[in-house]
């Protein structure tokens, strides 16, 4: 299938309007052309600096503009971040994402951020950060420290964007994505469904993502988590089939990207999640929280994977992490595979 960067809103709406079964069938066909089937990549997300964000994103409980139950916390110590990363690896995550509630990182924070990146990389995990807007120099610094992915969502269509955020422009977001790409990092960028946007806006979001010069390597699709105290706490729920349709169309439009089920998965039953995987989702966040919102427990995810026959992407194991029992097993295997005396010599008496 041709990878395109010239989609129109009309084309995307036509896909969204297809019969549900036909759309899922097409999305699954596209998915299997570009990705291992029955395979999901697992990430863990940690809030390394929580609350008191100067931005006015109407969906976000971390905004200083709204009264929510989120407490203000300073930038987390490097040791605590690395401890959380090790626990994430032990639980099966292959990527560790670190998020800070900032408009943009300050230069005084860059040394600590780079230390976090290097420490997580040393564990054999992929690294991702979401810190707000970046300058070209900051993007270069993070890339040189070894950051693999940078997350910066577009959130919604350009037309609906002003109804949700006024403290940074849509172009600000696109500029940050450009700086990230120029620095050689991979892009994680998606949006949020259920903020009161129209079908046109949902189509417009996917058009913006798919028409970037290079598709994002990871496309998180979030279902709004309504939080008391935010302006969007009373919006209508997303129709589950509409959400699954969006996953399917994202897969068709960006066939080589990972499509991630992100915020809102806690509200999805197993059947809805299964449909999302059928539609082409092949990545999830794993663990108890996504920044400040709940996420399904690890045990429930593993049970669902078992029911569906889904395999997790495995963490690359470093030589010094091989356990004594694993080493013994390997020795036994090698000894068993060695030729015996009867294999090497014939018995002249026979």
UniProtKB/Swiss-Prot annotation:
Chain sites annotated for binding [2Fe-2S] cluster: 97, 128, 188, 260
Cofactor: [4Fe-4S] cluster; [2Fe-2S] cluster
Pathway the protein acts in: Cofactor biosynthesis; biotin biosynthesis; biotin from 7,8-diaminononanoate: step 2/2
Enzyme class at the top of the EC tree: transferase
Any single GO BP term: biotin biosynthetic process
Gene Ontology molecular function, alphabetical: 2 iron, 2 sulfur cluster binding; 4 iron, 4 sulfur cluster binding; biotin synthase activity; iron ion binding
Reactions catalysed: (4R,5S)-dethiobiotin + (sulfur carrier)-SH + 2 reduced [2Fe-2S]-[ferredoxin] + 2 S-adenosyl-L-methionine = (sulfur carrier)-H + biotin + 2 5'-deoxyadenosine + 2 L-methionine + 2 oxidized [2Fe-2S]-[ferredoxin]
Coiled-coil region(s): none
Textual note on the cofactor: Binds 1 [4Fe-4S] cluster. The cluster is coordinated with 3 cysteines and an exchangeable S-adenosyl-L-methionine.
EC number of the protein: 2.8.1.6
Ranges where the Radical SAM core domain occurs: 38-256
Listed Pfam families: BATS, Radical_SAM
Keywords associated with the record: 2Fe-2S, 4Fe-4S, Biotin biosynthesis, Iron, Iron-sulfur, Metal-binding, S-adenosyl-L-methionine, Transferase
Chain sites annotated for binding [4Fe-4S] cluster: 53, 57, 60
CDD domains from the UniProt entry: Radical_SAM (cd01335)
Reported function: Catalyzes the conversion of dethiobiotin (DTB) to biotin by the insertion of a sulfur atom into dethiobiotin via a radical-based mechanism.
Similarity comment text for this entry: Belongs to the radical SAM superfamily. Biotin synthase family.
Oligomer and partners: Homodimer.
Protein name: Biotin synthase
Species assigned in the record: Vibrio cholerae serotype O1 (strain ATCC 39315 / El Tor Inaba N16961)
The gene coding this protein: bioB
